[in-house]
């Protein structure tokens, strides 16, 4: 950990949480790291943002990919004028595009702030409340499980073994009548 850097189990070189290199949009310069023969440095708080593929895990593939043809369709025999159809298509597409941009401009950062706070609280509760409660419960339940195991082996096992021996001597034979 000399110089404020450390290496993880996969061999990635990380910096300390303070952003000493780069910014949040391009934290590392891979070409420069290759030139100097250094490992690429990964910061736990920053990563390079892909501005082209903004849904790399395909979270919204089946939900928000709505096009004009998915919403409005004219069956055979009931067609409007071609100009109206083209204008409707253009109006729908442009309105959807710019209204989404307007909404994301107005509400994008506040919603990101709200969801960031929500997931920070969720992570905090999971790390500092849920996991310790579960571990505590598992430790405490071991005592009960030992007592329960002794009870089962002392009372239930002999009882069910005796019942099993009683019913094991029952024989059933079937006969077909002609």
From Swiss-Prot:
Q: Name one GO biological process term.
A: lactation
Entry-annotated residues carrying Phosphoserine:
2, 9
Q: Where is region (Interacts with SPRY1, SPRY2, and SPRY4) located?
A: 149-160
Compartment(s): Golgi apparatus membrane; Cell membrane; Membrane, Caveola; Membrane raft
Ranges where the record places region Interaction with CAVIN3? 82-94
Keywords of the record, alphabetical order, are:
Acetylation, Cell membrane, Golgi apparatus, Isopeptide bond, Lipoprotein, Membrane, Palmitate, Phosphoprotein, Ubl conjugation
- Identify its protein family: Belongs to the caveolin family.
Q: Which PANTHER family match?
A: CAVEOLIN, CAVEOLIN-1
Could you identify this protein by its name?
A: Caveolin-1
The gene behind this protein is Cav1
